[in-house]
Amino acid sequence: NYTSLIHGNAYPPIAEAISAAAVTGTVFPSMHLSQLRLAEEIIARVPAVDMVRLTNSGSEAAALALRIARRATGRRALVTVSGGYHGAVPPFTEGEPETRTLPFGDSAALSDMLDDHVAAVFMEPFLGAGGVIPQDPGYLRAAQEAAHRVGALFVVDEVQSLRNSPHGEAARLSLDPDLVLMAKIIGGGLPIGAVGGRRELLELTAATRPEHLEHAGTFNGHVATAAAGLVSLQHLTTAAISELNAHAQHLAEHIEAAGADRGFPLVVTRSGSILNVHPGDAPVTSPADAHRFPPERAALHLALLLEGIYTTPRGMINLSTALSEDDLSAVYRGYDRACERLAS
C-alpha cells in the first residue's frame, strides 16, 4: 500500500466513516464540513501548518507547492536530492531544465547549487522510493538555512514520513519548513494530497485575492476521502505510533539476524514503521547502495511471495496498526524460510 493504509485494509471505523459520508453526497461545489474537520486536524497536528490546501494525490500536492513557491519568489528553478521522489510528474522527473539535483548528503554542494534563481528546495526526511534511507538531520537543517539564505522556500515532503511521529518528522527533526507536502495516511486509504504551511503562502491561492494563484479540482477534498482521513489521523495516536515503530525495530533486527544465520545476508534500512530490506552485508547509506544486487532482490521478493509475504519489489515494508502478534510472527517465519530457500 506504499504507506497509505496505516490501519490496514477495510479498517472498520474508516469504512463506517466512508459509508456515513457517502449518504450525504460525494461531490459538492463548495466547502464541506468534512474538509474543514480534516484541515483542522492537520493544523492541530503539524506545527508548521497554518493553512491547508487539499489535492487528489501527493504528486498534485508537490506540483501545487512548486507553483506557490514560484508565485511567492518570482523564480523558476527548484532543487531536489538525488534519490528523492516527489511524484512522477514534470518538473520533478530527471532531465527537466529547471530542476537541479543535489548529490545525496553533500552539504558542500548546497552553496554551489543554490542561488537567486531557485524558488524552492524540496526534501524528504528519508528517501522513500530511494530505499528508505534517512537523511542526516544536520544536512536537512543546512539545506533549510541555505534555502532561506538565498530567498528560496524550504519544502518538506512528508507524504510518507508523517506517520512516523506524532507531529510529523519535520517537527521531530527541529525543521521549520515554509511548506509541507502530505498524502497517504491523511486520506485513510482513499486518494488525497495536501499542501500546508505558512498562512501568507497558502493565501496566494485564495479566490478572494486579486490575481490569486488558481487552484481548482472537481474532486479536491472529496467528502468520503476527508471523512476517512480524519478517522485515520485521530486513531493514529502517540501510543500507536510508538508501538508501530517498536514493532518495526524488532522486525528489522530479526530480518538481519535471519539472513546472517542462514547465509543470505540482508541489511535493513528503516524510518519509523517503514523498512526496506536490501541484499548484501555492506551498509546502505546512499541511493546507489540501495540499487545493488538486482537479481538477489528479485529472488528475495519471489521467495517471500511463496511464503505469503508481500513486500514491494524493491523490498519496502510498511507496518500497520492492524497487525497482530500472530501476523508479525508469520512475517518472521516467512523471512526465515525465504533466507533458507535462497541460501540453499
Question: In which residue ranges do the predicted regions lie?
Answer:
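Conserved N-terminal phosphate-binding loop of PLP-dependent enzymes in the Aspartate aminotransferase
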Residues: 1-344
